[in-house]
Amino acid sequence: MSQKLQKPSFLSEYLRSIRLFSKKCVRPSGKELSMSIKRHAIGIGFLGILGYAIKLIHIPINNIIVSSPGKE
C-alpha cells in the first residue's frame, strides 16, 4: 500500500524538479535564436549539396568500374 502512495509522490517530485530546472535555464533572445536557426539551415544545406556532389561524381565512376568492356 505504501508503494502505491510513493509512486505519485515520486512523479510529482520529478515534475517539480523539471519545472525548477526549466525556470533556471537561460533562454536565448530572438536575435540569437534566429541566428542559430540560420546557421543550422546553412549547415544542413551544405551537407545536402556535398552529398549530392559526391553521388554525382561516384555514379559515373561506379558505372565504369562495374561495366565490362565485352558487353554491349
Swiss-Prot record:
NCBIfam families per the UniProt record, alphabetical: secE_euk_arch (TIGR00327)
Name listed for the protein in its UniProt record: Probable protein transport protein Sec61 subunit gamma
Similarity comment text for this entry: Belongs to the SecE/SEC61-gamma family.
Record HAMAP family: SecE (MF_00422)
Origin superkingdom: Eukaryota
GO BP of this protein: intracellular protein transport; protein targeting
Compartments, record wording: Endoplasmic reticulum membrane
